[in-house]
Amino acid sequence: MTQMEEARKGNITPEMEEVARKENLDIQMLIRGIANGRIVIPSNINRESSPCGIGENLSTKINANIGSSSKMEDIELEVDKALAAVEYGADAVMDLSTGPMLRDVRKAVLEAVDVPVGTVPIYEAGVEAFMSDGAVVDMDEDDMFRAIENQARDGVDFMTVHSGITLETVERAQRSGRIMGIVSRGGAFLAAWIMQNQEENPLYSNYEYLLEVAYEYDVTLSLGDGLRPGCLADASDIPQISELLTLAELVERARDADVQCMVEGPGHMPLDQIAANMKIQKEVCDGAPFYVLGPIVTDMAPGYDHISAAIGGAVAAMNGADFLCYVTPAEHLAIPGVQDVIEGVIASRIAAQAADAARKLPGAWDSELEMADARRSFDWDKQFKLAFDSKKPYEYRMQCPIEDSEMCSMCGEYCALRILREDR
């Protein structure tokens, strides 16, 4: 049985117990959230991983994307990136490999990390069609579902499936006058296939079969936003919202089949539109967990998109987003390296922490109080221990060491805290 089915029967699984403990949440509240589809625990029956709850009343979670490309493929490097992401606090990892050895990368990542691992199976179907026949659009329905079944069997915990890309939504996108068109790679694969074959998207027309596979392995479906905006000017347009309405219907069908699912969201979006978009998704998708990429709030910061995404992510999480997909400094420019992954994870953790502290979640608020106490007490070691990145602040402090262990080189003997303490 899936986690959802167990919850609906009132059964408590080991995964539920662990999530309730981590979140300091009443187990019955957690069970209700899973049963009604507002919380998911991605946990494939073929793989053991550290359980992670995503959704209503839980702390904001972070995903880190890694993966090879046709231009750069190194299995060991991808494993190193996955391990670095987990070390710096990612709650999940997605392998988005599109290189010839994508299966080997996936299996290596699944073995290397103990957090939930996600994939986008349409990449495998498209890449194999390209390598064998010369074009992504040469994949057929069997290729698509074969990739999904193989990855489910391998132990993948959650999968992005672009079932909301349909004949109707593709035609609507073509008429929309978008500046950036379709920027989702998986969405583009399927849109091109639909236009080439003039047939309905198999992941939509045969959604019931997709649900059967997901149910068998308890794979959490991440309903992909293939029509997410690729620039601020395209945000909140008709293609984006029409796809969201399709995804809302698919959420209901997944729940009817006892299959866990979450919904993916934008994307590039002006700051003033984020809160409304989060609330629209939560309303039309009946509280399904919302998994957002960023959102990136300005297109003017290549090389610094992790900062842009953290700004958007904080606003999104404060208004209902449950799962933040990190963005690295290499976004839009190159495949990220290990250091890019680290910086992306830290930026997203800052966003998640800011939102969770604003929501007054006990764990987040308590850690803020701990850090404040450590600073007031000049407890540098504790400050470094509490920090998302303990190495960087330590290195800054060591750049200009001074004899007094309490002081730093910024204020020295004119430290406000010390002056007031000594006056008292």
From Swiss-Prot:
Binds 1 [4Fe-4S] cluster per subunit. The cluster is coordinated with 3 cysteines and an exchangeable S-adenosyl-L-methionine. The keyword Iron-sulfur applies. Pfam families: ThiC_Rad_SAM. InterPro entries: ThiC, ThiC/Bza_core_dom, ThiC/BzaA/B. GO terms for biological process: thiamine biosynthetic process; thiamine diphosphate biosynthetic process. [4Fe-4S] cluster binds at residues 408, 411, 415. Pathway: Cofactor biosynthesis; thiamine diphosphate biosynthesis. It is an enzyme of class 4 (lyase). Keywords: 4Fe-4S, Iron, Iron-sulfur, Lyase, Metal-binding, S-adenosyl-L-methionine, Thiamine biosynthesis, Zinc. GO terms for molecular function: 4 iron, 4 sulfur cluster binding; carbon-carbon lyase activity; zinc ion binding. Substrate binds at residues 65, 94, 123, 162, 184-186, 225-228, 264, 291. The keyword Acetylation does not apply. Disulfide bonds: none annotated. Belongs to the ThiC family. Catalyzes the synthesis of the hydroxymethylpyrimidine phosphate (HMP-P) moiety of thiamine from aminoimidazole ribotide (AIR) in a radical S-adenosyl-L-methionine (SAM)-dependent reaction. This is Phosphomethylpyrimidine synthase 2. It comes from Methanothermobacter thermautotrophicus (strain ATCC 29096 / DSM 1053 / JCM 10044 / NBRC 100330 / Delta H) (Methanobacterium thermoautotrophicum). The lineage of its organism: Archaea, Methanobacteriati, Methanobacteriota, Methanomada group, Methanobacteria.
